């Protein structure tokens, strides 16, 4: 006996998949854009994490708090797109590589920058968006 997946669930799965595919492509584009710089500091990952956190704050207000978009957009944008766009795993491995290669000062500043700037970005986005919408 097989159980059918409700149409609503299937739509949400597809919404996450669509958003995730677009977020992954956007993430890859940022990496490619920063590649020629050949910096020791992982600017591309920091950029997507801070920008993604800011956008998460904006869409949290628009979708969750104010319900200005249909709930399915939470799955497309917040779970799919921003989930794929931001990257904790890359941040983790880059931090480890910096530490292991003897660049512990850069590693520590990278970890602090990611955490402080990302949390600050989401807070600023929420405050600004609540005032503007």
Swiss-Prot record:
GO CC term (a single one): plasma membrane
Similarity-based family: Belongs to the fluoride channel Fluc/FEX (TC 1.A.43) family.
Name of encoding gene: fluC
UniProt function note: Fluoride-specific ion channel. Important for reducing fluoride concentration in the cell, thus reducing its toxicity.
GO biological processes: cellular detoxification of fluoride
Name of the protein described by the UniProt record: Fluoride-specific ion channel FluC
Principal subcellular localization: membrane
Subcellular compartments: Cell inner membrane
MF terms (GO), sorted A to Z: fluoride channel activity; metal ion binding
Membrane topology qualifier: Multi-pass membrane protein
InterPro entries: FluC
Cited Pfam families: CRCB
Membrane spanning residue stretches: 5-25, 43-63, 76-96, 108-128
């Amino acid at each position: 006996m097989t159980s059918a997946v409700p149409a609503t669930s299937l739509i949400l799965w597809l919404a996450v998949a669509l958003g995730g595919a677009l977020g992954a492509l956007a993430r890859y584009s940022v990496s490619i854009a920063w590649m020629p710089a050949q910096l020791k500091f992982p600017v591309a990952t920091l950029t997507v994490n801070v920008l993604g956190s800011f956008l998460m704050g904006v869409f949290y207000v628009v979708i969750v708090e104010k319900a200005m978009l249909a709930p399915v957009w939470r799955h497309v944008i917040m779970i799919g797109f921003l989930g794929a766009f931001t990257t904790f795993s890359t941040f983790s491995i880059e931090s480890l590589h910096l530490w292991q290669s003897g660049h512990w000062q850069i590693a520590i500043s990278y970890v602090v920058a990611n955490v402080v700037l990302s949390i600050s970005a989401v807070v600023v986005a929420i405050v600004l968006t609540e005032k503007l919408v």
